[in-house]
């Protein structure tokens, strides 16, 4: 499959090159409505990514087709040491194979200067196969374990957008609708000392729908009124089952707090209203209010427990902006927003990593509410641009990973709501061009965090200062040669229960353009010195826990990209790797 896809992409490169040459020869006769881009990136460990972007443009409508695919193997080495009622050491070797195909179709229609239609359809088919070998040592026993998970997902998402323009940017009405349906499958097998111990089967069917209407009106004094309503709903049905065998070790499976699944429904009704106006030559203000009525219905299938919540929230926002010149801008922003837990965090199924380590979501998580006040300063000149941001965040019921120990030394990775998390931070980004062929962009983020809360006797208190920084160098020549170096650093950071050690890496890339930059050849090295790693240690007196995880991030990539007929790059329908959520990293 991998070889065939590569051959297809190279064939497309050849076809597009010939098409571009033909188009140039006939450019004076007719304007070719086709444009596009084909790219292929390959590393030296048999991983690749590929993209095909095509556009067809007519007077009153445009059609776009995007394809993105990747196939890569990720190797992760992890260590976990724990000491609670006993000491346990684990060595884990994980190999994940990611295979993904994504397709997006977009149709833009402009039947008149006052009407705009947009239709979009996305299809995503990621598969992740995980093989994990674990050596587990206690003071009295030693086991060799093997865990295999075959995760697959099918997602279809469609959206429709309409805008009626009475007067551009002054008087407009827009309607928007989105529907998404996903089907997940997650069968797995587990062996201890080469003996089958259990199998599991699981599936989820998350869906969501969003309907929205927005209205913009400009008064004679140039003040703008924006208002709208929105309906959002998501629902999911999860079903997971564990099946043990006669070889089950110490009957550990029967002692788990298992849950077969969850039925979850959420309905959010929203209305918003805001008013903005330019006051004089230098000042602009915007004030608004956003209101949500949130209905949540949760049913646990194991014990038929129901947990229902009805909540009504107000979210005010305010902006004051001062622009003394074309080169400077000073602004104050206040916002209040809600962040809802996702289905990975809500799923109550107890997922075994090994017979002493488990993952389990928390179906009783509540949305976190963040109040944010910030002062932003922007300075942009001919050769320099400065962006500074001083902020204060206060998050009620902040969602955080939590690690639970039991008396038999069992470790459960879950989630909970803390009480309050406050952050004071400063972000500074400076971009300078000392010459026409060089750009230097240093950036730094400073943050002081204070959090508190308790969960099942666990203290979630944090009082910590940390910082991170990036340094990016770009060199560009007139002969379409580009060189980029990026160094990134993250200082040690404290989170509830743990201290995470520093992490840093260096990436290098060079790109050369040919045929007036239509064909681009690139070579890059990620994590040049192979320094990126994950280390976390417990910062409590109740138990000791240390986690080390090293992903094979050092890689060499070579890429080819061909643009024809002046194609303008657009965001592709790519599927990213799963987000890392837990503090304890074991190649999940």
Predicted regions and their residues:
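Outer-membrane beta-barrel translocator domains and adjoining extracellular loop/strand segments
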Residues: 76-84, 130-139, 185-194, 238-248, ...
């Amino acid at each position: 499959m991998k070889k065939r896809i590569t051959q297809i992409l190279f064939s497309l490169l050849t076809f597009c090159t010939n098409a571009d040459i033909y188009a140039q020869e006939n450019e004076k006769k007719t304007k070719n409505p086709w444009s596009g881009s084909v790219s292929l990136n390959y590393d030296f460990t048999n991983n690749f990514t590929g993209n095909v972007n095509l556009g067809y443009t007519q007077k009153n409508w445009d059609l776009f087709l995007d394809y993105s695919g990747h196939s890569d193997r990720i190797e992760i080495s992890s260590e976990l040491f724990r000491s609670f009622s006993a000491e346990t050491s684990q060595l884990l070797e994980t190999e994940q194979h990611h295979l993904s195909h994504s397709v997006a179709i977009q149709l833009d229609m402009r039947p008149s200067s006052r009407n705009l239609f947009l239709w979009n359809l996305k299809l995503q088919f990621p598969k992740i196969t995980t093989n994990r070998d674990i050596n587990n040592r206690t003071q009295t026993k030693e086991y060799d374990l093997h865990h295999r998970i075959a995760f697959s997902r099918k997602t279809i998402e469609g959206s429709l957008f309409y805008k009626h323009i009475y007067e551009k940017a002054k008087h407009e009405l827009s309607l928007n609708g989105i529907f998404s349906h996903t089907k997940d499958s997650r069968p797995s097998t587990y062996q201890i000392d080469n003996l089958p111990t259990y199998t599991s089967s699981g599936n989820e069917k998350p869906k969501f729908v969003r309907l929205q209407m927005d209205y913009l009106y400009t008064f004679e004094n140039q003040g703008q009124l924006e208002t709208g309503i929105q309906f959002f709903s998501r629902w999911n049905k999860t079903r997971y089952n564990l099946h043990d065998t006669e070889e089950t070790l110490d009957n550990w499976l029967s002692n788990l707090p298992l849950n077969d699944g969850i039925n979850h429904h959420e309905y959010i009704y929203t209305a918003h209203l805001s008013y903005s106006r330019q006051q004089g030559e230098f000042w602009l203000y915007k004030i608004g209010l956003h209101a949500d009525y949130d209905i949540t219905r949760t049913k646990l299938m194991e014990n038929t427990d129901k947990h229902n919540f009805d909540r009504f929230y107000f979210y005010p926002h305010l902006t004051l902006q001062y622009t003394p010149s074309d080169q400077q801008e000073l602004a104050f922003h206040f916002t209040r927003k809600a962040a809802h837990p996702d289905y990975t965090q809500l799923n109550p199924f107890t997922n075994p990593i090994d017979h002493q380590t488990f993952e389990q979501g928390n179906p009783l998580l509540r949305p976190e509410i963040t109040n944010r006040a910030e002062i932003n300063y922007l300075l942009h000149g001919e050769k320099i641009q400065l962006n500074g941001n001083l902020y204060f965040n206060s998050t009620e019921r902040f969602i955080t990973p939590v690690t639970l120990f039991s008396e038999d030394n069992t470790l459960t990775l879950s989630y909970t709501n803390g009480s309050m998390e406050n952050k004071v931070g400063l972000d500074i980004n400076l971009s300078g061009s000392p010459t026409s062929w060089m750009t230097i962009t240093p950036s730094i983020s400073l943050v002081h965090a204070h959090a508190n809360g308790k969960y099942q006797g666990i203290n979630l208190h944090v009082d910590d200062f940390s910082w991170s920084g990036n340094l990016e160098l770009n060199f560009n020549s007139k002969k379409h040669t580009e060189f980029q170096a990026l160094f990134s650093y993250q200082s040690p950071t404290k989170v509830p229960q743990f201290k995470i050690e520093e992490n840093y890496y260096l990436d290098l890339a060079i790109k050369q353009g040919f045929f007036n930059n239509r064909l681009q050849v690139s070579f890059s090295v990620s994590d040049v010195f192979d320094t990126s790693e994950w280390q976390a240690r417990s910062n409590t007196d109740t138990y000791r826990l240390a986690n080390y995880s090293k992903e094979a991030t050092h890689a060499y990539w070579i890429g080819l990209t061909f643009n024809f007929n002046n194609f303008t790059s657009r965001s592709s329908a790519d599927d990213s790797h799963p987000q890392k959520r837990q503090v304890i990293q074991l190649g999940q």
